[in-house]
Amino acid sequence: MFKGVLLLAFAASSLNLGAAVLTPEQALARVNSQAPMKLKGKALTSYKLSYTAVEDGQNAVYVFSQPADGKGYLVLSADDCADAVLGYSDSGNFDAQNMPEPMVWWLGEYARQIAAARNSNVLKAVERPERKPIEPMLKTTWNQDAPYNMMCPLINGQRSMTGCVATAMAQIVNYHQWPVQGVGSYQYFYNNSWISLDYSKITFDWANMLDSYADGAGNERQKTAVAQLMYACGVSVDMQYSPAESGAADLFVASGLVDHFNYDVNVRYAERDYFGLLDWEEFIYNQLTEYGPVQYSGSSSIGGHSFVCDGYSEDGYFHIN
């Protein structure tokens, strides 16, 4: 199982000159010279290889974890065409046998980017500007199952998941503790029936939303408070509900916030394809400093995920909740 938060370089395409497949030992050795601030001085010999992502028949990404106390893991490039440390957690744990879909997707995307870099004739080092660090803003560690999905539709007797888009959106709305009451109403047709919600009758119970509902935490009122918010977010983005996984497009989040949560009309949806790497990082950084947590998503031919970016470390890693 994956728990905790992860700090990530936004792209494996922050490339260095050269391209050579590395053994796990070589990949770990690179960390000594390129370690993020929080990892400097740590005994890396305590980290053990837990997972290898393979792309085009070659190792692309290694995950090393702390077997002793289960706290902390490293996501390393298996090729010197990319930064040594792609991401890390100094508190979470990593179980390769029980990885959630978001983690599977992240590692797969890094592997595909590194494989693409190997096949590219243009390898260029990226020089990032110095920026002030931003401490992680979210306190919540919410998920998609119970109690968060208590109000989601039942399909064949099974409760639907909230969906990652709704879960990310709900955590941001909870961060701002806004609005007190919803706006308007909305309905859409899905799975041979109409899903509808009158937002004007919803009063959000912010005071009773817990930062975590792990291990059965929360009384009935506290569980209902977060479930109501999750469902309100899901309906606003035309969530395609399912007990296995629920899906929606992030591009609907902005209109949902404006139309039913009374957010500013200037809330916007932006795509990475229209920015250069450094311009995109600057754009996200500025959003964090000016407006708070940013909902971020990524997708490929095999799927996608939505999550929250809510901080930035002094050595250039974005904090992902």
Question: What are these language model-derived features?
Answer:
Residues 4-13:
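Sec-dependent N-terminal signal peptides
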Residues 15-19:
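Sec/Tat signal peptide C-region and signal peptidase I cleavage site
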Residues 20-55:
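Short, non-transmembrane alpha-helical segments in secretory-pathway proteins
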Residues 21-25, 158-163, 167, 247-252, ...:
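Soluble non-cytosolic domains of exported or imported proteins
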Residues 33-38, 79, 167-179, 259-260, ...:
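Structured segments of extracytoplasmic/periplasmic soluble domains
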Residues 49-70, 255, 259-319:
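Active-site-adjacent substructure of cysteine-protease-like catalytic cores
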Residues 77-92, 315-321:
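Catalytic Cys-His active-site segments of thiol-dependent hydrolases/isopeptidases
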Residues 85-246:
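Active-site-adjacent structural segments surrounding the nucleophilic cysteine of cysteine proteases
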